[in-house]
């Protein structure tokens, strides 16, 4: 899994004009293909008179898709995907809509124009960094609970959820590189009485 990725904190726009053709880019955070597809259809509906609306989306689960939407192959969808990848963006969808200005741009001109509009939008999106964290469930007696928060904090971790009943149940996260040290320490301190299970990892906002 990726150690981190960037994703837009908010929708953002970019626009350029090249030989009377207008290129309007929009980037938005998305969590899954359903959100990405809905966003793309929303943009196409908004710009129904435009000649082309190309797009790219990348998801942290590995799903990805792009389209040139009728432009020459390799001049639109692939270049904006490459820009997103080089800038470490994920969980986002990016569209670039073209209103044709009557002058052909050629493959090189199209590639430069779509790339410039996409970059313009990306630069306005106020990205947030999402970092991979290990996640665990803990169960312990109350006598051991008071030690856990300070040890977690020492290793860059935090409590995500807690339940206090006959025993204490916690969901915690911490950087993967500190997970073994943390668990070796609490195992030693509790004499093996803190029960731990590894859960699916997650990404947390920096």
Short names for language-model regions:
Residues 1-74, 195, 200-206:
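C-terminal regulatory domains involved in ligand/effector binding and gene-expression control
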Residues 44, 84-89, 115, 119-126, ...:
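Signal for well-folded cores of large energy- and translation-related assemblies
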Residues 47-50, 155-160, 187-195:
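A common structural junction motif
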Residues 62, 72-89, 162-166:
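Positively charged, aromatic-enriched nucleic acid-contacting surfaces
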Residues 79-124:
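Active-site beta-strand/loop microenvironment that shapes enzyme catalytic pockets
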Residues 126-142, 170-172:
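Short glycine-/aliphatic-rich beta-strand segments at the starts of folded cytosolic domains
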Residues 139-157:
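Short amphipathic alpha-helix segments
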Residues 172, 178-181:
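Terminal, non-globular segments
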């Amino acid at each position: 899994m990726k150690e981190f990725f960037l994703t837009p904190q908010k929708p953002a726009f970019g626009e350029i004009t090249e030989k009377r053709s207008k290129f309007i880019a929009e980037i938005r955070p998305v969590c899954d293909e359903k959100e990405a597809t809905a966003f793309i259809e929303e943009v196409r509906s908004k710009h129904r008179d435009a000649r082309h609306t190309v797009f790219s989306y990348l998801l942290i689960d590995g799903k990805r898709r792009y389209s040139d939407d009728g432009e020459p192959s390799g001049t639109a969808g692939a270049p904006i995907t490459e820009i997103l990848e080089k800038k470490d963006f994920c969980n986002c969808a990016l569209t670039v809509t073209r209103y044709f200005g009557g002058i052909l741009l050629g493959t090189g001109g199209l590639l430069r124009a779509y790339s410039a509009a996409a970059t313009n939008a990306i630069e306005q999106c106020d990205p947030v960094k999402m970092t991979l964290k290990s996640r665990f469930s803990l169960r312990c007696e109350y006598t051991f609970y008071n030690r856990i928060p300070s040890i977690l904090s020492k290793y860059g971790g935090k409590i995500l959820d807690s339940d206090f009943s006959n025993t204490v149940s916690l969901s915690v996260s911490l950087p993967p590189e500190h997970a073994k040290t943390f668990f070796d320490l609490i195992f030693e301190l509790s004499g093996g009485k803190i029960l731990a299970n590894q859960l699916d990892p997650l990404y947390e906002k920096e």
